[in-house]
């Protein structure tokens, strides 16, 4: 299982990458592996305001549909349109090609609630 050390993680299995005051968000390798083959991804509209733990979309696999939850509050400023035509990217490249949204955070202190790679690894092994 791939677990980049430079990212932050939520207990809902989203990853967060800090980039120039914005946050790029996707689901973890662990999450995509648990879901199986992804066949559809639903994402929010650009401009949508999210609060921490709000559902912001869903991923549908051959097994189930799973909600996506905002790891931090903020405004959606970019979505990954490639996932509409290529949902399999979530399985193939969860940390690169399959990022889902970029948000401008409204409260950066919420980042302190997220897990380091080491703590996320311990969380998923429990």
UniProtKB/Swiss-Prot annotation:
This is Glycine cleavage system H protein. Keywords: Lipoyl. One of its GO terms (biological process) is glycine decarboxylation via glycine cleavage system. The gene is gcvH. The modification N6-lipoyllysine is found at residue 63. One of its GO terms (cellular component) is glycine cleavage complex. The glycine cleavage system is composed of four proteins: P, T, L and H. HAMAP family: GcvH. InterPro entries: 2-oxoA_DH_lipoyl-BS, Biotin_lipoyl, GCV_H, GCV_H/Fam206, GCV_H_sub, Single_hybrid_motif. NCBIfam families: gcvH, PRK01202.1. Residues 22-104 form the Lipoyl-binding domain. The keyword Cell wall biogenesis/degradation does not apply. Belongs to the GcvH family. It comes from Oceanobacillus iheyensis (strain DSM 14371 / CIP 107618 / JCM 11309 / KCTC 3954 / HTE831). PANTHER family: GLYCINE CLEAVAGE SYSTEM H PROTEIN, GLYCINE CLEAVAGE SYSTEM H PROTEIN-RELATED. The glycine cleavage system catalyzes the degradation of glycine. The H protein shuttles the methylamine group of glycine from the P protein to the T protein. Its cofactor is (R)-lipoate. Binds 1 lipoyl cofactor covalently.
